[in-house]
């Protein structure tokens, strides 16, 4: 998710809370969940991997997300950097990838899901990519990861200030696997909310761009607003 400007934070934060509540009701508080098989995260994913070691440059269209970009379950692209083009293969980000901060006390375990279509975008080696095996698992795995940040953080190795999240420990995490009908119904509920979040974000990015374009002209007097009746 692309981080929205403050203008719309409250709306999207409320939508995020709704999504989290729905996930909890369907998959945590639901007594039927005990009947679903317990499986490893590895069995439900096609990729669990750290990102790349980038070579930074301003003269590139390729974007590298870092740990600062992942906060409060949002992805803030404005804090990303550009790097020299390389063949990245499977580490190009895809819609639905779950991103997990993987180094450092206080940041390790933070998670967010890619709910936009990324273009020429990857992550650095301090972030783990978790890719669901299919579209039917996308929202389930993403929201499961976001709701299990503390459990993910507890998997760390190393001493204070040098903590790391081992990939194998992430892959070995266990979760319930709902039946396909339940997943389909859950996706039908979640998808419109996610779509609304993205629409709000895109609108706010557009408004922020207009604001940033107009403000210098207003400050310099290039645009005269003295005759506007309020």
Language model feature labels by segment:
Residues 2-52, 172, 176, 180-225:
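Non-catalytic DNA-recognition/assembly elements of restriction-modification systems
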Residues 12, 67-68, 124-127, 142-204:
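Glycine-anchored helix-breaking recognition loops at helix->coil/strand junctions
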Residues 31, 60, 65, 161:
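Active-site donor-nucleotide binding/catalytic segment of nucleotide-sugar enzymes
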Residues 37, 54-61, 155-157:
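Short coil/turn segments at secondary-structure boundaries
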Residues 42-55, 63, 68-98:
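Sequence-specific dsDNA recognition surfaces
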Residues 85, 131-132, 175-177:
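Short beta-strand-to-loop capping motifs
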Residues 89-150, 156-161, 166-170:
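A short beta-sheet element
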């Amino acid at each position: 998710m692309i981080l929205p400007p403050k203008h719309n934070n409250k709306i999207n934060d409320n939508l995020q809370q709704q999504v989290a509540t729905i996930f909890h009701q369907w998959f945590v508080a639901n007594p039927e969940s005990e009947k679903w098989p317990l499986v490893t995260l590895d069995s439900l994913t096609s990729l669990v991997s750290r990102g790349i070691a980038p070579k930074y440059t301003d003269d590139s269209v390729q974007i590298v997300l870092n740990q600062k970009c992942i906060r409060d379950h949002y992805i803030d692209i404005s804090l990303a950097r550009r790097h020299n083009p390389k063949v990245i293969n499977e580490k190009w980000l895809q819609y639905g990838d779950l991103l997990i901060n993987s180094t450092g006390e206080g940041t390790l375990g933070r998670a967010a899901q890619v709910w936009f279509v990324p273009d020429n975008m990857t992550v650095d080696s301090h972030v783990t990519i978790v890719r669901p095996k299919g579209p039917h698992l996308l929202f389930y795995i993403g929201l499961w990861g976001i709701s299990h940040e503390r459990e993910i953080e507890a998997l760390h190795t190393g001493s204070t200030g040098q903590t790391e999240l081992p990939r194998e420990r992430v892959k070995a995490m266990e979760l319930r696997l709902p039946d396909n009908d339940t997943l389909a119904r859950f996706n039908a509920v979640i998808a419109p909310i996610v779509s609304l979040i993205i629409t709000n974000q895109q609108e706010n990015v557009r408004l922020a761009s207009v604001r940033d374009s107009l403000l210098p002209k207003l400050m310099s007097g290039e645009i005269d607003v003295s005759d506007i009746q309020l």
